Amino acid sequence: MLPFLPEPSLSYTQQNRTAVLLLNLGTPDAPTAQAVRPYLKSFLTDRRIVELPKWLWYPILHGLVLTFRPKKSAHAYEKIWFKEGSPLEVYTARQAAALAERMPDLIVRHAMTYGNPSIADVLAELKSQGVGRLLAIPLYPQYAASSSGAAVDKVCEQLLLQRNQMSVRTISRFYDDAGYIDAMKNHILRYWAEHGRGKKLMLSFHGVPQKHYDLGDPYPDECRHTAKLLAEALELTEDEYTVSFQSQFGRAKWVTPSTQDLFGKLPKQGVTELDVFCPGFLADCLETMEEIALMGREQFYEAGGKNYRYIPCLNDNPDWIDALVALAEENLGGWR
């Protein structure tokens, strides 16, 4: 059994501060194979991500995936890396800073399920600052066991090590939150006003294996519900938008339709002008900037497409920060 973590030199009456912790997936520390490998290892050894027996999965992971994938992934990260660091880390930090500015009576931090800043390190910092109440917000509007579930797992792992445990609240999902929907609507309308509008809007969400859905993961249904609400807010007809799922890997069957498949099919169906937005990603990252903005464009044009626009994620959009503040205030309740 692991020992309890040391408690800070604070009396119990001093451990009464409230904090908001924004949680995102994670990123390697640098766009190099050496940095990507430990990140992938921590990610792909989580039972929330790969639901296979260790005896079956670990030989594949260590013998193939961690041998060949880091170099390929590092090359992809190089294409989208900012001077300040990983886009996901940069934008998530900006969201936390904006939230802190709007809620100055609280401590606001961000942490990653995998990589840095780690949930363990940030919770230790908050404990030392006298935080006794924590609102953890996984930055995934649609709940999936492999995203929101994994993030909350990491928080709970640290609670198991605390002798004097924090009080913790989490927000498991907000796929139908009015502020979130309104922020996306305004963001897309502004983009269209500035850059023009295609014939169809693709709403691309991260995929999950079909088996996860069959076993009770509500994620695909929540994605489709979000898409419906957003389409209604934008006053789109059913012919003017489509919903798809991206980022599949491995040989298992994933939920459909596949974003990558549609890049090849839509031009052949007469859709040669396409806009793509990813409602489930609240910060631009590898899956949006490289997979959709760069590779998706190539796939669409190779299939005969003529005009392709990637609409960036909400990132630190002021409307999204407004929605995030409202979401936090609603769930903090009497803690403020």
From Swiss-Prot:
The keyword Manganese does not apply. GO terms for biological process: heme biosynthetic process. Fe cation binds at H206, E287. It is found in: Cytoplasm. The keyword Lyase applies. It is an enzyme of class 4 (lyase). This is Ferrochelatase. The gene is hemH.
